[in-house]
């Protein structure tokens, strides 16, 4: 089965057939923030696509032929071409498909977006550390790290004097960093943006975007997934289905 809410494919499953002409396939996982980047771009650009969910706790053998790292997201087109690594898949979609351009044409503005992505780059690993941390001392130290990283992003918005990181409308960089901010509430980390008012306004503006709101995961589902994921349960990726 394919689709956003289809159960994931695991070890022993048969590989899906060829991608139909005129479509593109994303190998994804419903709760993965890296895969969400690519799903946001697919939705924002209105690209016809199918979704194959992968069980990351029980990966199918054939999936390593799609991506030697065994990670999502992976894109596969009807020519059998494979593209992986989330930021690369997003740039590919923007260049390969018509419609709204999410990356700026201007080389300097494009470079600015990539530099902001570098400024953000510690946040995903901090989220991973926070999820796995076991004691209050770890929590306190990690929360301080989050505040430091968010201050850097606050400075970008302050200097730009715009609502979004690429200007006055949503662009690629906003979609690339959003999935981790979406999860702050579920992880009880909202207080880490209390000192960054412009970042809080950006988060509120992002939730108003039709693409973002269509792909939001409820706090309950995210916490349910996380509980099973930390137990290494193969059922984690299908939580709520």
From Swiss-Prot:
What does UniProt note about where in the body, tissue by tissue, this protein is expressed?
Answer: Ubiquitous. Highest expression in liver, pancreas, skeletal muscle, spleen, thymus, colon, blood leukocyte and heart. Lowest expression in brain, placenta and lung.
N6-acetyllysine sites (modified residues): 57, 143, 148, 152
Q: Give the annotated active site.
A: 32 (nucleophile)
| InterPro entries in the record | Glutathione-S-Trfase_C-like (IPR010987), Glutathione-S-Trfase_C_sf (IPR036282), Glutathione_S-Trfase_N (IPR004045), GST_C (IPR004046), GST_omega (IPR005442), GST_Omega/HSP26 (IPR050983), Omega/Tau-like (IPR045073), Thioredoxin-like_sf (IPR036249)
Gene3D superfamilies in alphabetical order = 1.20.1050.10, Glutaredoxin
Q: Name one GO biological process term.
A: xenobiotic catabolic process
CDD domains for the chain: GST_C_Omega, GST_N_Omega
Q: How does this protein's activity depend on the pH of its environment?
A: Optimum pH is 8.
Q: What are its GO cellular component terms?
A: cytoplasm; cytosol; extracellular exosome
Q: Residue ranges of the GST N-terminal domain?
A: 22-101
Care to name a GO molecular-function term for this sequence? methylarsonate reductase activity
Q: Which residues carry this modification: Phosphoserine?
A: 129
The Enzyme Commission number assigned here is: 2.5.1.18, 1.8.5.1, 1.20.4.2
Activity regulation text: Monomethylarsonic acid reductase activity is competitively inhibited by 1-chloro 2,4-dinitrobenzene (CDNB) and by deoxycholate.
The record's listing under PROSITE patterns reads:
GST_CTER, GST_NTER
Where in the numbering of this chain does the GST C-terminal domain appear? 106-230
Modification N-acetylserine, positions: 2
Residues noted as binding glutathione in the record, renumbered to the chain: 59, 72, 85-86
Query: Which reaction(s) does its UniProt entry say it catalyses?
Result: RX + glutathione = an S-substituted glutathione + a halide anion + H(+); L-dehydroascorbate + 2 glutathione = glutathione disulfide + L-ascorbate; methylarsonate + 2 glutathione + H(+) = methylarsonous acid + glutathione disulfide + H2O
Please give the family membership noted in the entry.
Belongs to the GST superfamily. Omega family.
Describe the subunit structure: Homodimer.
Function comment: Exhibits glutathione-dependent thiol transferase and dehydroascorbate reductase activities. Has S-(phenacyl)glutathione reductase activity. Also has glutathione S-transferase activity. Participates in the biotransformation of inorganic arsenic and reduces monomethylarsonic acid (MMA) and dimethylarsonic acid.
This protein's name: Glutathione S-transferase omega-1
Specify the species: Homo sapiens
Gene expressing this chain: GSTO1
């Amino acid at each position: 089965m394919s689709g956003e809410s289809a159960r994931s494919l695991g070890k022993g499953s048969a590989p899906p057939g060829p991608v139909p002409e005129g479509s593109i396939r994303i190998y994804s996982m419903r709760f993965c923030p890296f895969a969400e980047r690519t799903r946001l771009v697919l939705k924002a650009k209105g690209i016809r696509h199918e979704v194959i969910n992968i069980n990351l706790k029980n990966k199918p053998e054939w999936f390593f032929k799609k991506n030697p790292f065994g990670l999502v997201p992976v894109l596969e087109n009807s020519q059998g071409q494979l593209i992986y690594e989330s930021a690369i898949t997003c740039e590919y979609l923007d260049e390969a498909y018509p419609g709204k351009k999410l990356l700026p044409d201007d080389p300097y503005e494009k470079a600015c977006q990539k530099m902001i992505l570098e400024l953000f780059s510690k946040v995903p690993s901090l989220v991973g550390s926070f999820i796995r941390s076991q004691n209050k001392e770890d929590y306190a130290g990690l929360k301080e790290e989050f505040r430091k990283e968010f201050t850097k992003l606050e400075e970008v918005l302050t200097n730009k004097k715009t609502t979004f990181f690429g200007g006055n409308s949503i662009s690629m960089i906003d979609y690339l960093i959003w999935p981790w901010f979406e999860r702050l509430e579920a992880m009880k980390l909202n207080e880490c943006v209390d000192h960054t008012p412009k970042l809080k306004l950006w988060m509120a503006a992002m939730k108003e975007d039709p693409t973002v709101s269509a792909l939001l995961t409820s706090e309950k589902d995210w916490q349910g997934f996380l509980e099973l994921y930390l137990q290494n349960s193969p059922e984690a990726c299908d939580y709520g289905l």
